[in-house]
Amino acid sequence: MPATSSTIRYGMLLQTKKNKKNQDTTIMKAKYALIALLAITFWGCDDNTAGLGLGMFPGSDQNINGKLSTFDVTTESVHAGKIYAMTNVGYVGKFTDETFGTYQAGFLAELNCPSGMTFPGVYNGTALNDKKKATNIMVDEAGLGDDAIGIYNTDNINDPKRKLIGNIHTIELYLWYSSYFGDSLTACRLSVYALNENLDTKNAYYTDITPEDYYDANTDNSLLGTKAYTAVDLSVKDSIRKLSTYVPSVHVSFRDKAAKEIGKEIIKRANELGVNFDNKEFRKIFKGIYVKSDYGDGTVLYIDQAQMNVVYKCYAVDTLTGVKLEKKVVKEGESKDSTYYGYRTFATTREVIQANQLDNDKDAIQKCINEDTWTYLKSPAGIFTQITLPISQIADSLLNQTAEKRQSDILNAVKLGIPIYNETSDKKFGMSTPSNVLLIRKKYKDSFFEKNQLSDEITSSLFRPTTTSFTQYTFNNITQMINDCLADREKAEKEIHEKGSITIKITDLDGNSKDETVNNIKDWEDLSEWNKFVLIPVLVTTDSSSSNSYYGSSNVISIQHDLKPGYARLKGGKKGTIQDAKGNPVYPAVSYTHLTLPTTSRV
């Protein structure tokens, strides 16, 4: 992969410290993912916050002395590990890339039973119920024919109270999608399985979920149906596909045996409970689906909704009189009664769980992580870029020798810019650069998504581009994030001083945790990852109803992991920590320029 060889000015981090006789101005310059300086300003705190920035100091403080210093920012590629994947979009398909290997996706989902949903009653000489509404429209025994199976209130054929309560024709599943990744005409196939274990709403479902824990791998017991498809269905006329109202789908018909058994249980239980038939009761009968890609490489569908229709046979009736309508044309051997198929829908919604299972090529991902002359972002659940900020050095320069000064210096306006390599590719279906990325303290990278939080500029900061031609991820002010780190360090130092030690919880990539006890701040810094941040590709949802038509802005209402295939190659990498004989950083393939700024003195 090409690397640039020109001299690049990545930015700088400016800090100004005020004291009675002079002010020290420190300029901190990072490697590639450099803290670009808008301004970091320190000043003596006198309960007057009007003096933010050099230009806002009183006249007597305008003349200052300054000196220059530099500090490195370290970046490296790290495994994304398992990520939180409970979203309202299901991903299914397979795609192989020459750099990142094969990525495969499938999803597990519950289906929602609408509150108060009921099935029609059986026609009993009239379709009208006690309230004179035509709700008894399911065919009676005479209308069952060969295309519907009767459902009775008891399986005991000798029971004198046995009666027909409904029928089942089939069950169909529609997987609706508005977009996809990859080749529109790659031949693919998916299979749908019935879950035999409930998805627990109390657990956070991650991309490493094991589907086999929730369904019977014996296909005779769990397979509901299969379907071959292409992302663009050429059997649909162009004129139809071009309609704004057209939404493509993969249509899966349940196997006859599965449809009859599941449909019978659903309708029977719904008949018993009436309007009290709810999600809890529905889940006892049908726990959900697992949608798995089992053939084809080159396409990933983004499923907006899975919709299961329980289909039954009905009479066409006069809604006023309740009388069956007759066919206008009756073929020999056919019933004269006019019939049609009705259905009740159970679909994926925000009220139920949908969990994506994503599988990346571990060897290919590891090879990319081992690359040390740049870093990667790779979605979904592939690679994050970890950033280590020089906060310990910032703290040392911020804190003076006296306790009074330790409490009086503050930080203001730090800008971080992370340059992106401009990629050129002749791949027909190349992955795009992630547009929205979240910079977050490493300690919060899991809980942020579990709790469905929004960026607060204290523990996290969101980058949203204002143009499609952006060349770096820019975070205009991470000051509060640095202050949050410093607050953690101060708290740890205080606890060590008062108690003699502090216990740190360390979690590995697999989610395994262990406790470590340290008795000095240096060991705490080394183990706590207090100064580490992670750059994560995200999917941002905005509230269109709150859009400001004049400024074109809208409120962010949700930030989730981006589960669409995408990647970016970022300038940086672990080689930036290597120094030459003079102690200067060495940057492979990119020349590094120390920034020099003039020093001003008070007269």
Labelled PLM ranges:
Residues W43-G44:
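C-terminal motif of bacterial Sec signal peptides marking the signal peptidase cleavage site
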Residues F181-K257, K428-C485:
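Beta-strand-rich interaction/scaffold domains
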